[in-house]
């Protein structure tokens, strides 16, 4: 199977987000890459499901709380910018203060 670099990046996000979800379910606190992957994955899937940019900007800030991540991780992520594919094209979704 041949994948473009963009497709490989999306696949890596899915794998990292799945690992993060499993660790969270086991009660483990997430580190920086896991937290970013989980939020990114949920926003990408929301775009695929037809949600708007505004909806995803709000939704992205509800996925994880400070209790879900290791100490200091929330402060390391002031915002996340995700290039998501919507039915009408690719758009940039910025989630401000994603972990509250």
Swiss-Prot record:
Keywords attached to this entry: Cytoplasm, Hydrolase
Compartments it resides in: Cytoplasm
Disulfide bonds: none
Predominant place of localization: cytoplasm
Enzyme Commission number, as recorded: 3.5.1.5
GO CC terms of this entry: cytoplasm
Enzyme superclass (EC): hydrolase
Keyword Hydrolase: yes
Biological process (GO), any one: urea catabolic process
One GO molecular-function entry: urease activity
Cytoplasm listed as a keyword: yes
Substrates-to-products reaction catalysed: urea + 2 H2O + H(+) = hydrogencarbonate + 2 NH4(+)
Functional pathway: Nitrogen metabolism; urea degradation; CO(2) and NH(3) from urea (urease route): step 1/1
Record-linked InterPro entries: Urease_gamma (IPR012010), Urease_gamma/gamma-beta_su (IPR002026), Urease_gamma_sf (IPR036463), Urease_subunit (IPR050069)
HAMAP family in alphabetical order: Urease_gamma (MF_00739)
Membership in a protein family: Belongs to the urease gamma subunit family.
Subunit structure, interactors included: Heterotrimer of UreA (gamma), UreB (beta) and UreC (alpha) subunits. Three heterotrimers associate to form the active enzyme.
Record protein name field: Urease subunit gamma
Phylogenetic classification of the source organism: Bacteria, Bacillati, Bacillota, Bacilli, Bacillales
């Amino acid at each position: 199977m041949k994948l473009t670099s963009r497709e490989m990046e999306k696949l890596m996000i899915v794998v990292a987000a799945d690992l993060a979800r499993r660790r969270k379910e086991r009660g483990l606190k997430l580190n920086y890459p896991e937290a970013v992957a989980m939020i990114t994955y949920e926003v990408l899937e929301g775009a695929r499901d037809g949600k708007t940019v505004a909806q995803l900007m709000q939704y992205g800030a509800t996925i994880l709380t400070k209790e879900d991540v290791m100490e200091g991780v929330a402060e390391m992520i002031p915002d996340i910018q995700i290039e998501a594919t919507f039915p009408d094209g690719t758009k940039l979704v910025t989630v401000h203060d994603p972990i509250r």
